[in-house]
């Protein structure tokens, strides 16, 4: 079975990897009979890869042990594998000696929230009414109009002010509007741009290195969310001395072979000002005594790795990254362009079907559409039952971007909010 009408050289190249995806030939019985499962929900999560699962089971499995010891063969093996995996991750994103790697949670959401706590931007909800921060020292965060909720709502719950950078007339990231906002808040002492590298709804990319350059010229910092694009693009934290990224976060579970991994955060250690780790516990202290005395480890990565680390998760992340590198980023992008062109050609001929941001075909392989007078969940169910296609409906955790794409004005938005609040979840 071919993905396009004619098998291309790239399709033939990727067959060697595709055949090892667990479930690639899976079938199930729907109301319409036996269907072959066709997975197209990669933007949400990747798929298990048999060689990685077998390597974890057969090569690492026999030596699984806690990493907090190096006096046994098992403890030493896991500790060495854990540290080697961390080095693989750092090298993949072109981190330098000043960058710190932290893994946490199950994806980008966990690490961006942890990072906000590390930066001292989160306070307990019951203490907010007692906290008054002068405007001059209140952080300002700039986000794009295309953010996933994780890189929007999490910032809204910090002590910072948050500004959405207006899109340009074509619905793209607008550097001119961004510069205006930076100038507007030039008096703020802590300026942050936290933007997605690519929309998880349309696959449209942002000029994040240019954003970083502008932030650095204005004494600010730039954080980039690679959750959507990470499995497919080069991640380069240090392309030059001006456009470097101060922090990145991504979700390895979206990689081929990545489900079951932790979120990844890499950031410049100069942003770390803390004496106390975010998660004090085992492995974070040099010593304690019965009288309340204690000293935390100086090394930031060790100090912020409290408790038994997710060593298998980190090892699996490194294996998924090595698989990405073996496939080749340019091969991945070239194949994505083939598929995007093919899907556009086929869907644009379907009556009453509208591709969102269809004027922008220069994108990663993320395509969202709606069908006139058809509820999205019914559409997803039909695709599943009739054709075996695995996808998802709804706003894809990007409700703000949905307003832009569907031209939802404030009055319509408020009406929808009222209906949803009253329990009419079909409108959601």
Task: Name these PLM-found stretches.
Residues 1-428:
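Pyridoxal 5′-phosphate
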